[in-house]
Design a protein with these regions (language model features):
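Conserved functional hotspot residues or short segments at active or partner-binding sites
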Residues: 273, 277-372
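Glycine/threonine-rich flexible loop motifs
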Residues: 134-146
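Glycine-rich oxoanion-binding loops at beta->alpha junctions
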Residues: 96-125
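Short internal beta-strands
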Residues: 76-82, 163
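Conserved anion/nucleotide-ligand pocket segment
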Residues: 183-254
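Glycine-rich, charge-decorated loop segments at or immediately adjacent to ligand/cofactor-binding or catalytic sites
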Residues: 87-92, 161-183
Length: 390
């Protein structure tokens, strides 16, 4: 009896160890585009290089800027997207032009008034490298910055290299396709909320579908992620922005970002942003939290220094796009005669259409709403096939 139990226990331990080992091996087998110097360094020789980078642009533990400087690459400009070069600016906070104190290289903001660099700014740039970790959601603005940088490169005859990285939400394609009249910086391309593509794949699609001016003129090179597939698990080594601190927040982001157009808090001003929802005076649940001012993440969060009650989603298994949180909160506030879509225009920009908001206001269920965009998703999935790398 003892021997049988022992061997059963040993077998289970061995199986668990094997699974863990294989998972670790899979993680270590991945080489992001930036790590594959042999595939792009020859292109940079004797060229003036501009980098679109932030805190996620790492080669192992070393920033791409430092890695390239150590290899004597001539970096003339660093272009900073939303949240800044160091990733220490709150969402929507102004990013200023500056000079990097460590390297002396000019920092050019591409978030704010000047989202697309002028011919003058690019006059000393031969090649632009884009290396930023994305999360696979249309309204996450790094892909909008990539769009404008690609367009500027095409117009000025500058080469464009994308050093690809995994998409933590690559398994999901969901949400309405963006309609042209709702185009904005939080949604430029006619793609779903969750597009299931890496930035490299999306760059190929932007060029191939002619979504930028002079798309045919753009010399684009994508360095794929080695050892990566659409089923490869990937945990981000660095938080991609101040309010997406972990894998759980990234998984919930597509579902909770719509609350930004409402009076409801999604936890900005806490250590668990995009992992909770809360409101006052209407209690959305039993969980309570109090947002505080956090420099570089949430200086003036909703309900600053006020306790709100709602739902703790830190241990939920939500993935993809879940509309029930939004629909349930709408019903609770409406019953209490509280205005829900207080920023209706912004809601429609996030959704890429007014149909989602109108359907919620009309009382449609999540299943009915999702059914309404299935034809568009089917068309998109077919359209993207030529551009997929994994």
């Amino acid at each position: 009896m003892f021997k049988t139990v022992f061997f059963t226990f040993f077998f289970i331990l061995s199986a668990l160890f094997t699974v863990a080992t294989h998972a670790n091996e899979a993680k270590h087998a991945i080489a992001v585009g930036a790590e594959q110097f042999a595939l792009y360094l020859p292109q940079l020789k004797n060229k003036r290089v501009g980098l679109v980078v932030n805190q996620t642009s790492l080669v192992g533990q070393t920033h791409l800027v430092d890695s390239l400087l150590a290899k004597n690459i001539n970096i003339t400009k660093i272009f900073a997207p939303e949240h800044g070069f160091r990733g220490d600016h709150d969402a929507g906070a102004h990013v200023k032009n500056a000079v990097d104190s460590k390297t002396g290289i000019a920092l050019i903001s591409i978030y704010g008034k000047n989202k697309k660099p002028s011919a003058k700014v690019l006059s000393d740039v031969d090649i632009i490298i884009f290396d930023i970790q994305d999360v696979g959601v249309r309204f996450y603005t790094y892909i909008s910055s990539m769009h404008y940088m690609m367009e500027a490169a095409a117009e000025q005859g500058v080469e464009f290299i994308v050093l690809d990285r995994p998409n933590p939400n690559i398994a999901y394609v969901d949400g309405p396709l963006l309609e042209p009249e709702f185009k904005s910086f939080v949604g430029i391309h006619p793609i779903p909320v969750l597009h299931g593509m890496t930035v490299g794949e999306l760059a190929k699609m932007i060029k191939g579908e002619g979504w930028i001016n002079q798309a045919r003129d753009l010399k684009l090179n994508v360095i794929p992620v080695a050892g990566y597939t659409r089923t490869t698990p990937y945990s981000l080594p660095v938080k991609p922005s101040p309010n997406l601190p972990n894998d759980q927040s990234i998984a919930l982001y597509p579902s909770l970002c719509f609350f930004e157009a409402t009076p409801i808090s999604i936890g900005r001003g806490t250590d668990f942003a995009f992992q909770v929802i809360g409101y006052s005076p209407v209690a959305l649940g039993e969980f309570s939290f109090t947002p505080r001012s956090i420099k570089g993440a949430a200086l003036n969060p909703k309900f600053k220094n006020q306790m709100v009650k709602g739902i703790d989603l830190r241990h939920s298994d939500t993935v993809g796009l879940n509309l029930n949180y939004l629909i349930n909160a709408y019903q609770q506030l409406t019953q209490a005669k509280q205005l829900f879509f207080e920023r209706a225009d912004f809601m429609d920009k996030l959704a890429g259409t007014d149909k989602l908001r109108l359907a919620i206001e009309a009382g449609h269920s999540a299943e009915e709403i999702k059914q309404s965009w299935q034809a568009g998703l089917k068309q998109f999935k077919q359209q993207r096939v030529p551009y997929l790398l994994y």
